[in-house]
Amino acid sequence: MTRRYWNINLEEMLEAGVHFGHGTRKWNPRMAPYISAKRKGIHITNLTRTARSLSEACDLVFDAASRGKHFLIVGTKDKAADSVASAAIRARCHYVNKKWLGGMLTNWFTTETRLHKFRDLRAEQKTGRLNRLPKRDAAMLKRKLSHLQAYLGGIKYMTGLPDIVIIIDQQEEYTAIRECATLGIPTICLIDTNCDPDLADIPIPANDDAIASIRLILNKLVSAICEGRSSYIRNH
């Protein structure tokens, strides 16, 4: 894998609060190598380690995108949801930002069945067929469509398992991480000072609670994906 330059700036990360961890009482001792200091009862993340991990992750996603691989971005908590959707749409990635439905990957057959139902209902709505049904039936199907849009809208074009999964909050998305581990799907995880770096293939030590921090990390990753996709298009 070729190392590239991704313009990862320590000052920019400081401004975004990437270095702020959790209170020292909440820390995970396995995060010790990624922590540089304690300040006012809070652990401070070593941004040099963050930059190194982020650069490695950008190299990985660029390389994967340049070979036509598919990505899934997962972040369901309120502070991450909007950033996840906009980053994924920009880089044409699949995303989950509402709720991780257990078995979404490990029980792919069921997920695929739901996606087929979702696509059928969307098609019926677009053609106006739903409006020609009895009011009660139409209302029930519209509620069903709204529910599917909320939970599966970000993966509606997914036709198989992703090649790489990017996860914003390790503790919040523990089920997703376990499913990826079961299936052998590589994960890139933002890990705050209360997380376990050993659960991710590429852990990126960073503040996973601040919107600015989440957005900065995602922007770097999707920029690398977009560059990789451009390379893939040029060569095919």
UniProtKB/Swiss-Prot annotation:
- GO term, biological process aspect, one: translation
Q: Does the keyword Cytoplasm apply?
A: no
Chain segments annotated as coiled-coil in the UniProt record: none
Keyword Ribonucleoprotein (UniProt): yes
Taken from the UniProt entry, a GO cellular component term is: mitochondrial small ribosomal subunit
Q: InterPro entries, alphabetically?
A: Ribosomal_uS2 (IPR001865), Ribosomal_uS2_bac/mit/plastid (IPR005706), Ribosomal_uS2_CS (IPR018130), Ribosomal_uS2_flav_dom_sf (IPR023591)
Keywords of this protein's UniProt record, alphabetized? Chloroplast, Plastid, Ribonucleoprotein, Ribosomal protein
What GO molecular function annotations does the UniProt record carry, in alphabetical order? structural constituent of ribosome
Output the CDD domains linked to this UniProt entry: RPS2 (cd01425)
Record localization: Plastid, Chloroplast
What's a Pfam family this protein contains?
Answer: Ribosomal_S2
Q: What family is it from? A: Belongs to the universal ribosomal protein uS2 family.
| UniProt xrefs under PANTHER family | 30S RIBOSOMAL PROTEIN S2 PROKARYOTIC AND ORGANELLAR, SMALL RIBOSOMAL SUBUNIT PROTEIN US2M
HAMAP family in the record, alphabetically? Ribosomal_uS2_B
Instruction: Spell out the protein name for this chain.
Output: Small ribosomal subunit protein uS2c
Question: Which organism encodes this protein?
Answer: Illicium oligandrum
